[in-house]
């Protein structure tokens, strides 16, 4: 028996003899960090060793290239399953996890450069760690050799059996960008650490971080980059809205000023505009005075006594029968006593003008003036 086969058989016997609730289980979601794992080696130091990485949260799972790089950074490779015994050993590792649905990446991938019309699909696949083993555990009608290049080991406990039987632990080609769990394998060049003893004499190494410090720094950088991109996206939304906000502020201010001015104009009296358009004539400067009111204001002395410095102008209507259009009467400027004349003209030095608006007609003239004549009266300054 080869040494590798003996190691695998011994590990398998230890796993089968160990109770499931013992402290020697491979991985525990409560004990291990989701991005950590535990090496399982024969005797604690003999190679190869394995580390099964399972994520309860599907969002934390990795695609094929990410899983491959993670194993390499930890000093290993994606697992290459070279014999049927090793396949059963990996199955026991996964069963010991009591894990729910979630496939596992293995280190088998199709090589596009080997693809030709004469090459069978299954012959295009090779192990990424350089192993030349031809052992395969494909499900029925797999691989499909379409756009699915990378290979997973089925782990769907809740899935019903298909046409080829149970899917559990069978191989299937899948798209490399899918998110899955993965298994790392560590060969003889992996340095050993102080192991912990399992029941039955076997030992395992303590849980070690799956990702080194450099990978954690990269995760921090990625988180910072995502936050910065989110801040930039928010800035791209807010900056174009600033001119619109300023326009709204200016428009609101202009409307508010206009409304205030309109209210102020409505509350002011409108007499100023009316005076400007239709000025009220001042009575002291108007030539159309009410002579009757002026006469009432004059004293009886002005009405009774003539004054030597005033010139009385009297008018007399023609006594003829001519029509008003042909009227050519004589008029006389006679200074007579108001009591002797047939009509009276008044003059006032205080008022600055002469008015003659009171006419006393004799009875015989009164009748004739009504029938054939009319009288003109004017104001002389």
UniProtKB/Swiss-Prot annotation:
Residues 45-185 form the C-type lectin domain. Disulfide bonds join 71-184, 150-176. Residues 330-374 are annotated as: Interaction with NF2. InterPro entries: C-type_lectin-like (IPR001304), C-type_lectin-like/link_sf (IPR016186), C-type_lectin_domain (IPR051505), CTDL_fold (IPR016187). Sequence repeats lie at residues 340-344, 350-354, 356-359, 371-375, 377-380. Glycans are attached at residue 117. The keyword Transferase does not apply. The keyword Hydrolase does not apply. It is a single-pass type I membrane protein. Residues 1-24 form the signal peptide. The modification Phosphoserine is found at residues 286, 299. Residues 337-381 are annotated as: Interaction with TLN1. It is found in: Membrane. It comes from the Eukaryota. Residues 257-381 are cytoplasmic. Interacts with TLN1. Interacts with NF2 and RDX. The C-terminal domain interacts with the N-terminal domain of RDX. This is Layilin. It comes from Mus musculus. The lineage of its organism: Eukaryota, Metazoa, Chordata, Craniata, Vertebrata.
């Amino acid at each position: 028996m080869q040494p590798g086969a003996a190691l695998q058989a011994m590990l398998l016997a230890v796993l089968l003899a160990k109770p499931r609730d013992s402290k020697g289980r491979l991985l525990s979601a409560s004990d291990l960090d989701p991005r950590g794992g535990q090496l399982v080696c024969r005797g604690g130091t003999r190679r190869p060793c394995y580390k099964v990485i399972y994520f309860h949260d599907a969002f934390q799972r990795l695609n094929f290239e990410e899983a491959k790089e993670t194993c390499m950074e930890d000093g290993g490779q994606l697992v290459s399953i070279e014999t049927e015994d090793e396949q059963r050993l990996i199955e026991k590792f996964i069963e010991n996890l009591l894990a729910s649905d979630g496939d596992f990446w293995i280190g088998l991938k199709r090589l596009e450069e080997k693809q030709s019309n004469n090459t069978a699909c299954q012959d295009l696949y090779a192990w990424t760690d350089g192993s030349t083993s031809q052992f395969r555990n494909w499900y029925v009608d797999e691989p499909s050799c379409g756009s699915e290049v990378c290979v997973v080991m089925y782990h769907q406990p809740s899935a019903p059996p298909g046409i080829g039987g149970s899917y559990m632990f069978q191989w299937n080609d899948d798209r490399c960008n899918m998110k899955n769990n993965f298994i790392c394998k560590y060969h003889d060049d992996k340095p050993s650490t102080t192991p912990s003893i399992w029941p039955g004499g076997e030992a395992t190494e303590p849980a070690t971080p799956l990702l080194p410090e450099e990978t954690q720094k990269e995760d921090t950088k990625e988180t910072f980059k995502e936050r910065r991109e989110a801040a930039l996206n928010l800035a791209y939304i807010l900056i174009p809205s600033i001119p619109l906000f300023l326009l709204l502020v200016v428009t609101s201010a202009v409307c508010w000023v206009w409304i205030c001015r309109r209210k102020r104009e409505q509350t002011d009296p409108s007499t100023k505009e009316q005076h400007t358009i239709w000025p009220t004539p001042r009575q002291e400067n108007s030539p159309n005075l009410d002579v009757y009111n002026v006469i009432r204001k004059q004293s009886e002395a002005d009405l009774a006594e003539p004054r030597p410095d005033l010139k009385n102008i009297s008018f007399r209507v023609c006594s003829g029968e001519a029509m008003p259009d042909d009227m050519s009467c004589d008029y006389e400027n006679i200074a007579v006593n108001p009591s002797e004349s047939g009509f009276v003209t008044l003059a006032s030095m205080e008022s600055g003008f002469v008015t003659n608006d009171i006419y006393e007609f004799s009875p015989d003239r009164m009748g004739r003036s009504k029938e054939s004549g009319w009288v003109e009266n004017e104001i002389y300054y």
